[in-house]
Amino acid sequence: MTFAKITQAAHYVPENVVSNDDLSKIMDTNDEWIYSRTGIKNRHISTGENTSDLATKVAKQLIENSGVDPELIDFIIVATVTPDSMMPSTAARVQAQVGATNAFAYDLTAACSGFVFALSTAEKLISSGAYQRGIVIGAEVFSKVIDWSDRSTAVLFGDGAAGVLLDNSGSQPLIIAEKMQTDGKRGGSLLSSYADIQTPFASVSYEGSNLSMEGRAIFDFAVRDVPKNIQATLEKSDLAAEEIDYYLLHQANSRILDKMAKKLGVTRDKFLQNMQEYGNTSAASIPILLSESVKNGIFSLDGQTKVVLTGFGGGLTWGTAIINL
C-alpha cells in the first residue's frame, strides 16, 4: 500500500507585531481586557504582503529544506478565506512563484478548519497512488477584512501562513482516523467578505465586506460541538484521549482550549498553544503551531508522535484528524 507522510513543515508571519497596548491606542480596549478574555498578547499584521506572498514564502521554505525539484511537486492546496483574488487562486499564484510547473493548484475554503480539510484531501490524493508529492498551506491576511473600529473582532485576528510537504514515503497511514463536519444553517454566525448581487438586473443593496461574528454563539459551538467531534474521532481510532501525545487545535481562544481539555479529561499541557503571539490566524493557526513545535523540538516528523489536529470556525465547519507525525 501507499502511505502519505509529512516530511517538512514551515511557517512565516509578517515582521510587524501589533501588541494589545498598540491596539489600545486606536480603540477602546486594553491589554488586561484582551488577554483575560482571549489569551492573546500580540498578533503579526501585514504592512503590504498579501496572502499569496505569505504562502509563497512558506512553499519556498518547504522546497528548499527538502531539496525537492519544484517540477516534481504534483499539487498545491492553499486553505484560505482571504485570497488575493477569486481568480487566479492563491494556490495558482504560489505555483507560479515557486516554479512548480507540473503541479495543479487550487484554494480550499473552510475558514479555520481549512488546513485540516486540506490535509485530509492531500492524504487521499497521495495514498490513492495517483500522486507522489504535494504541498498543503494555510494562509490568511485577516487584517484586510477586519473592521478596525470593532474591538470585539479586531483584537482577535492576525496574519500568517504555514504548511507541510507530503510525499508517498510513509511506512504507516498518516491519518489514523478523521471526522469532518459542516453546518451551513449556522453559517450566519461568522461572516466575511459578503457581497450581494450587484448588476443592472438586480436591485439589492450592498451590505459590506468586513468580518462579523456572533461571539457567544461561536464560543458555545466550539465548546459544545467540537469536543464531541474529537471524541467521535478517537472512538474511530480505538485510541483513548490520554494516548494522544499532543493536541493541536485551532488557536482561537485560550479559554476554549481550557474547556476542551477538561471535557476530554486530558491534561492541559497536551494542548499546545501559541495564540498569545499570533492571535487567531484562521486556516494558518494549526500549521503554524505544528511548524513551531517541530522547530522547537517538541516533536519531530519521524512518525513516532500521535497528534490530534482539530479545526473549527466559519461555515460552520469543524473537523478532526488523528495523525502519525
From Swiss-Prot:
Subcellular location: Cytoplasm
Region described as ACP-binding: spans on this chain: 251-255
Record GO terms (molecular function): 3-oxoacyl-[acyl-carrier-protein] synthase activity; beta-ketoacyl-acyl-carrier-protein synthase III activity
HAMAP family: FabH (MF_01815)
Entry domain remark: The last Arg residue of the ACP-binding site is essential for the weak association between ACP/AcpP and FabH.
Active-site residues, Swiss-Prot/TrEMBL: C112, H250, N280
Pathway the protein acts in: Lipid metabolism; fatty acid biosynthesis
Database matches in Pfam families: ACP_syn_III, ACP_syn_III_C
Similarity annotation: Belongs to the thiolase-like superfamily. FabH family.
Signal peptide segment: none
Disulfide bonds: none
Purpose: Catalyzes the condensation reaction of fatty acid synthesis by the addition to an acyl acceptor of two carbons from malonyl-ACP. Catalyzes the first condensation reaction which initiates fatty acid synthesis and may therefore play a role in governing the total rate of fatty acid production. Possesses both acetoacetyl-ACP synthase and acetyl transacylase activities. Its substrate specificity determines the biosynthesis of branched-chain and/or straight-chain of fatty acids.
Substrates-to-products reaction catalysed: malonyl-[ACP] + acetyl-CoA + H(+) = 3-oxobutanoyl-[ACP] + CO2 + CoA
Domain of life: Bacteria
GO biological process: fatty acid biosynthetic process
Subunit structure: Homodimer.
UniProt-recorded name of the protein: Beta-ketoacyl-[acyl-carrier-protein] synthase III
Keywords, comma-separated and alphabetical: Acyltransferase, Cytoplasm, Fatty acid biosynthesis, Fatty acid metabolism, Lipid biosynthesis, Lipid metabolism, Multifunctional enzyme, Transferase
Organism in which the protein naturally occurs: Lactococcus lactis subsp. cremoris (strain MG1363)
Record EC number: 2.3.1.180
Gene Ontology cellular component terms for the protein in this record: cytoplasm
